[in-house]
Each structure stands twice: as C-alpha cells, then as structure tokens.
Design a protein with these regions (language model features):
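Gly/Ser-rich, low-complexity
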Residues: 1-72, 88-97, 107-178, 217, ...
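Alpha-helical transmembrane segments of helical membrane proteins, especially in multi-pass transport
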Residues: 175, 179-211, 225-246
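Residue-level signal for the membrane-embedded core of alpha-helical transmembrane segments
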Residues: 65, 69-79, 103-107, 111, ...
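Membrane-water interface regions at transmembrane-helix termini and the short interhelical loops
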Residues: 81-94, 183-187, 215-216
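Membrane-embedded alpha-helices of multi-pass transport/permease systems
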Residues: 75, 120-123, 127, 185-188, ...
Length: 289
C-alpha cells in the first residue's frame, strides 16, 4: 500500500515538475525572443519598418505640408528683409551686403525645405548605425541558455514536496501570464515610438522653413533636437534591454526558485517602466521640449 502511495506521489510530482518546466521554458524563451524583437524593431529605419506607411507619410509631407512650409518661408523671409533694412538707422545706412546675406538665407531655407526628408532620414540612418552596433555588443552577451537554466533547477525541484510544487506551478503560471501582458506593453511602446517618428517626419518641412530666421529659428532648432532624441531613444532602449537580460541571466542561477520567479516579474516591470521613460530621458539629454 505504501509503495502505491509513493508511486502516486512520484507521478503527481512528475506532472507538476513538467508543468513548472513548461512554464519556465516559455518564460525564458519569451525573454530571449523579446530581447531579439526589441533589437530588431528599434534598429529599423522609418523606410524599413513599413514601406507603405513611409510612402504615405512622404506623399503627405511633399503634397500637403511643403506648400504650407512655402508660405512660412515667404513670411519669414519678408520679416527678415524688413528687419535687416530697418535696423540700420531707419534705412540710412543700408549696405548692399545685406541683400546678399538675405538671398543666401533664402537659398538655404528653400534648400532645407526641399531636402527635408533626406535630412530627417539621415538622422535615423545614423541612429540605426548606433543601435546596430549596440545590438552586436549587447545581443551576444544576453541570450539565456534555456536548457542549461532548466537543468540547474531540476535537483531543487525533485527535492520539493507536492504542496510546494503546486505553489510553484501557480507562481510560474501567474508570472508567465504577466510576461505575456508585459510583452504586449513593450510592443505598444515600440510601435508607439515608430508612429511618433512618422508623425514627426510628416510635418518636418514647417520647422525647417523657420531655421534661417534669428527669432523663429528656435522652432527649427527644437525640432532638430527632438528628431535626434527620437533617434537616440533607440540606443537607450537597447541599454535597458541589455541590463534586463543580464539581470535575468543572473537570476536563473538563484537558489530560491520562488524569489527567482518573482524577481523575473519585477525585472520585466522595470523594463517596461524604463522603456516608457526612455523617450523623456532622450529629450532631456538633447534639451528638446
């Protein structure tokens, strides 16, 4: 009779350990997949992320926003000419060089507006180069060996009794569900960043039209700061992901499985919070408003 109970006990333990291993394998697999997904998504340029959206944004910018930017240039250049002429002793000390300077500013303003997309895409090409370099350094050191991690836990699982294994099954199931929710939030953050980039690029001719004016130029300067901040945000996201993966990799070796499971959940929440804050941090670095 006792041998039958022992056999049933071992059978139940095997089922529970199998469920725990399945949950842990899914969680660690999700970590590896999410690290790779974030690196791939952040490293894409606006052209590479979705060609159809990029084409639509470019057409809107060239056909709708550029004419408005032309009106802005006209106003800015007229204001600039009036200011340049009148500031010299009410037109008594007018120098012909002023007109040369005005024509040069007009040329630069028109050039910037007509080449807006080339300039904005150059910013994100540079950002892609930085992110790709970071992904090469970070990605090679953060991949978790799922098989090795599970093998290291097997002895500890076999020593546990059924109640503790049941508790661990519930914990791993709960944390696995939380990981799925966090994964959705991370996807929302990444897609939200790209949509913000497209929206930012769509109106780029207007701030570029103001850059040659001393007073209005702050609009264009702040726009450029924001543009660089959006590009640099990808690098900050890669740093957050790298730190997260290293923390998870060290957590796998923890002796207490219960604390390790909830540490994984805590690290994932911290990752989401860090990704949310990466945009504000990038803007503060570039002093963009």
């Amino acid at each position: 009779m006792e041998s039958i109970l022992d056999a049933i006990n071992e059978w139940i333990k095997k089922i529970l350990i199998g469920a725990i291993n399945g949950n842990l394998s899914t969680m660690f697999g999700d970590v590896n997949e999410k690290v790779g997904t974030i690196a791939a998504e952040v490293g894409k340029t606006p052209q590479g992320w979705n060609a159809n959206i990029f084409s639509m944004i470019q057409n809107l910018s060239e056909n709708v926003i550029v004419p408005i930017a032309g009106l802005v240039i006209t106003y800015v250049l007229c204001y600039e000419l009036i200011s340049m002429v009148t500031e010299k002793n009410n037109m008594h000390d007018v120098d012909t060089f002023l007109f040369f300077k005005w024509f040069f500013k007009a040329f630069v303003a028109v050039f910037l507006v007509t080449h807006t997309f080339d300039i904005t895409m150059a910013v994100f090409d540079m950002a892609q180069h930085i992110v790709s370099g970071a992904a090469g350094v970070i990605g090679g050191d953060t991949n978790i060996d799922v098989t090795e991690a599970l093998a290291a836990m097997q002895e500890g699982l076999k020593d546990m009794e059924i109640p503790e294994l049941l508790l661990l099954v519930m914990e791993t199931s709960l944390v696995s569900l939380c990981m799925k929710i966090m994964s959705v939030l991370i996807t929302v953050i990444l897609y939200g960043r790209m949509i913000e980039i497209y929206a930012y690029c769509s109106v780029s001719p207007i701030p570029f039209a103001t850059m040659t004016n001393r007073e209005w130029g702050q609009i264009g300067n702040n726009y450029l700061k924001g543009l660089f901040a959006l590009g640099f945000q990808g690098f900050l996201i890669m740093i957050c992901v790298g730190i997260y993966a290293v923390l998870v990799g060290e957590m796998v070796l923890a002796d207490n499985l219960h604390s390790a499971i909830f540490s994984l959940a805590a690290y994932t929440v911290i990752l989401c919070f860090s990704l949310f804050k990466s945009g504000a941090l990038a803007k503060s670095i570039f002093n963009a408003h």
